């Protein structure tokens, strides 16, 4: 859950698509406030869900996490952004700590509907919220499998490439969608390792069955990863690439 609690976009109070100039302006502001012992808050702090600690160490760590294009995109996958009225309504409920109500609102927009530019943000927000839900009180398999389904739709949609380029603030990047999804799935497999083949947990077969919306290449990678490494020697890629 630290990918949510200490998400650099949350700690720094920046939106996913802020320009470098806007990012530096906000970093300067919160650094100065913190140095003199003043608190600063932002709309998406979501303190009813998790406490937030904007000490200088967390601020500096967060700055490093978004310096590289790949890790900036990866950390964005564990945060939110607002792009339409339905997002706004959801965030009003989420700011009050009501996860289930927010899911209900966003599911109406995403479930069985075509994902377009207009509701892509809601899909992104909903999958992030399911990440929180499956983690918040131990492991919840139904929420986890729904999270994978939504994330697969998110990655496979043509809007994702536009999204990642906008995060990086550049059309010129050598980062491939497969590199992003592969690094992402490594992190998820590592996180759920304690629940594999456990009571009230999940099996690798159930995980693979939830990857229908991911690319064939990613499915092949997960199948290889989960069958050829029974000891689950999976790297922590998100944190490693931040260094």
Show the residue positions of the predicted features.
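Residue-level detector of alpha-helical recognition elements and their boundaries
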Residues: 41-42, 77-78, 117
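Long, intrinsically disordered, low-complexity Ser/Thr/Pro-rich regulatory/activation regions
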Residues: 62-72
């Amino acid at each position: 859950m630290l990918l949510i609690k200490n998400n650099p976009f949350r700690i720094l109070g920046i939106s996913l698509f802020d320009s470098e100039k806007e990012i530096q302006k906000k970093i300067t502001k919160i650094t100065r406030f913190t140095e003199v012992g003043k608190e600063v808050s932002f709309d998406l702090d979501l303190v009813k869900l998790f406490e937030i600690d904007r000490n200088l160490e967390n601020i500096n760590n967060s700055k490093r996490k978004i310096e590289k294009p790949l890790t900036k995109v990866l950390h964005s996958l564990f945060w939110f952004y607002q792009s339409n009225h339905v997002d706004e309504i959801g965030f009003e409920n989420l700011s009050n700590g009501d996860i289930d109500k927010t899911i209900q609102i966003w599911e109406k927009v995403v479930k069985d509907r075509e994902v377009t530019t207009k509701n892509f943000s809601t899909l992104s927000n909903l999958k992030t919220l399911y990440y929180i839900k499956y983690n918040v009180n131990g492991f919840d398999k139904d929420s986890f499998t729904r999270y994978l389904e939504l994330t697969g739709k998110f990655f496979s949609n043509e809007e994702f490439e536009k999204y990642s380029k906008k995060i990086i603030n550049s059309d010129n990047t050598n980062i491939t969608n497969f590199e992003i999804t592969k690094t992402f799935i490594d992190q998820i497999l590592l996180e759920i390792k304690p629940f594999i083949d456990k009571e009230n947990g999940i099996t690798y077969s159930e995980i693979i069955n939830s990857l229908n919306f991911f690319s064939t290449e990613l499915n092949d990678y997960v199948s290889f990863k989960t069958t050829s490494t029974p000891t689950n020697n999976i790297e922590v890629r998100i944190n490693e690439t931040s260094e």
